[in-house]
Amino acid sequence: MTVRTKVSTKDIDEAYLRLKNIVKETPLQFDHYLSQKYNCNVYLKREDLQWVRSFKLRGAYNAISVLSNEEKNKGITCASAGNHAQGVAYTAKKLNLKAVIFMPVTTPRQKINQVKFFGDSNVEIVLIGDTFDHCLAQALNYTKQHKMNFIDPFNNVYTIAGQGTLAKEILNQAEKEDKTFDYVFAAIGGGGLISGVSTYFKAHSPHTKIIGVEPTGASSMYQSVVINHSIVTLENIDKFVDGASVARVGDITFDIAKDKVDDYVQVDEGAVCSTILDMYSKQAIVAEPAGALSVSALEQYKKQIENKTIVCIVSGGNNDINRMKEIEERSLLFEEMKHYFILNFPQRPGALREFVNDVLGPQDDITKFEYLKKTSQNTGTVIIGIQLKHHDDLIQLKDRVCQFDPSNIYINENKMLYSLLI
């Protein structure tokens, strides 16, 4: 069997017909808050409302459904940080197939539980590897040994075509309301979504600019297409945006992206966290980190999108509630609202009250106070966390901290120290 490497609009049209009674046609919603904030017309494609709460069902079902009966009977495997696994599990249950699903050990518990829920007895889960790429290597080895069929999360023509049905759906919905779009913002992990969407848009709405969005700590497509002009493997990636933390993109997705994606945006993980909280509080949308990437990119593109009509694909909503504390912490650090210092603190009654009176501003709060080391001397080493009401107050706060302890250490500027102590 010849392995195909080119995706056509015909592939996407055929995938659309296969998926018509399988996936949900998710809403294309006008967003008043973002439209007012950026002085443009912002529409959100709500794939967080899909049956498995992400777009990944489209590609997984399409890729599995084209297998022969003989191939289906041998069973399927996949490697996934969560959402593709849920799509494969849902499909395995629907088609009554055996599936072995490999997931990194860092996968949020919520996503693991959802895979079990969707796949039930049809699915076996193997947790292995710290990153997707390590997990992928183990899955491929297992697939070969057991002569099963690997369902690639992004580097497969049928997976990409399935994701591309999103673009067809967007254009169909827009046509009903006589709309056209100037920009589409979509997240990039391995590149399956951006490849499918860009393929269809460039054929049917060539004036629309396609903007790929990656987390700063895992910008493998940008590094490959723009910087290196060939596929690179990132040595280290930040795994926080787990749905888009891929060290190496696919060769098929790379070839499509370099020809059809107009620009790339890298978004700081802290900015993603701020977007997650903003979407929840302002729009009542529960987005996972990768699902919030497209909206996060608008801040960097605010001049270009003014008075334009744009679509942000909210690619997933599988967020683990147990991560919210970390999300809030990362957001506060990014917004420069929370600050940590190591101080030599007087070990005598009333010292903390003096610190509050002399160092803290009237609207500042102490969020952490912990002795690293108590001694018999006059001072002890303390970690102190301070949350500001306004980030503009930081300079004055640092000045007052220096007066209190000229030898203080500002932890925010040292990522390694922060990870060790906070």
Swiss-Prot record:
One GO BP: L-serine catabolic process
SUPFAM superfamilies with a match to the protein in the record: ACT-like, Tryptophan synthase beta subunit-like PLP-dependent enzymes
Reported cofactor(s): pyridoxal 5'-phosphate
Keywords: Amino-acid biosynthesis, Branched-chain amino acid biosynthesis, Isoleucine biosynthesis, Lyase, Pyridoxal phosphate
Superkingdom per UniProt: Bacteria
N6-(pyridoxal phosphate)lysine modification, residue list: K56
Catalyses which reaction(s): L-threonine = 2-oxobutanoate + NH4(+)
EC number(s) on file: 4.3.1.19
Top class in the EC scheme: lyase
Domain ACT-like: residue ranges: 339-413
MF (Gene Ontology): L-serine ammonia-lyase activity; pyridoxal phosphate binding; threonine deaminase activity
Pathway: Amino-acid biosynthesis; L-isoleucine biosynthesis; 2-oxobutanoate from L-threonine: step 1/1
Binding site for pyridoxal 5'-phosphate: N83, G189, G190, G191, G192, L193, S315
Disulphide bond pairs: none
Keyword Cytoplasm: no
Family, per entry: Belongs to the serine/threonine dehydratase family.
PANTHER family per the UniProt record, alphabetical: THREONINE DEHYDRATASE, MITOCHONDRIAL, THREONINE DEHYDRATASE, MITOCHONDRIAL-RELATED
Job description of the protein: Catalyzes the anaerobic formation of alpha-ketobutyrate and ammonia from threonine in a two-step reaction. The first step involved a dehydration of threonine and a production of enamine intermediates (aminocrotonate), which tautomerizes to its imine form (iminobutyrate). Both intermediates are unstable and short-lived. The second step is the nonenzymatic hydrolysis of the enamine/imine intermediates to form 2-ketobutyrate and free ammonia. In the low water environment of the cell, the second step is accelerated by RidA.
Oligomeric and partner information: Homotetramer.
Entry protein name: L-threonine dehydratase biosynthetic IlvA
Gene name of the encoded protein: ilvA
